[in-house]
């Protein structure tokens, strides 16, 4: 009976010790750079592998709406952009979405400059920050 008890204790401890994991890899580029003309585009992609279900949230520092309307800014000046998502996500920005376990689920993030930068906007460096938050 003592041996059986030790075996059960060891078995239950091994289940506790199994860690869940998620990893991100395969970034095509860490930075999205738009050219200085209307409708210019940039994109990146990456893969997520999780051995358990996870939730994912795509966000932008300057996000205006969940359909991806955002802007780049140099402080006082703004240029409107459109952010797009493809992958297992619903395509919504600023909305946490639950996903099932997967191996190498590919996500693509793209941005398009919606406004003409030559229409009265001063030259400068215009920025936005995109973040991806994963909970598992």
Each PLM stretch: what is its role?
Residues 12, 61-64, 75-76, 86:
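Short, flexible beta-strand-to-coil junctions
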Residues 18-73, 96-136:
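N-terminal small/polar-rich segments of proteins
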Residues 3-13:
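Sec-dependent N-terminal signal peptides
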Residues 1-3, 19-20:
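Absolute protein N-terminus
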Residues 77-103, 107:
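Mid-chain, well-packed structural core segment of small domains
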């Amino acid at each position: 009976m003592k041996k059986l008890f030790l075996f059960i204790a060891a078995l239950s401890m091994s289940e506790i010790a199994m860690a869940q994991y998620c990893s991100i890899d395969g970034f095509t580029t860490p930075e999205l750079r738009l050219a200085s003309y209307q409708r210019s585009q940039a994109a990146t992609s990456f893969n997520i592998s999780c051995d358990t279900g996870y939730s994912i949230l795509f966000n932008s520092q300057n996000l205006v709406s969940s359909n991806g309307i955002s802007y780049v800014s140099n402080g006082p000046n703004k240029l409107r952009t459109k952010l797009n998502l493809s992958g297992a996500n619903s395509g919504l920005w600023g909305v946490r979405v639950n996903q099932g376990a997967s191996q190498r689920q590919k996500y693509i993030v793209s941005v398009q400059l919606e406004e003409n930068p030559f229409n009265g906007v001063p030259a400068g460096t215009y920025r936005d920050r995109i973040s991806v938050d994963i909970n598992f």
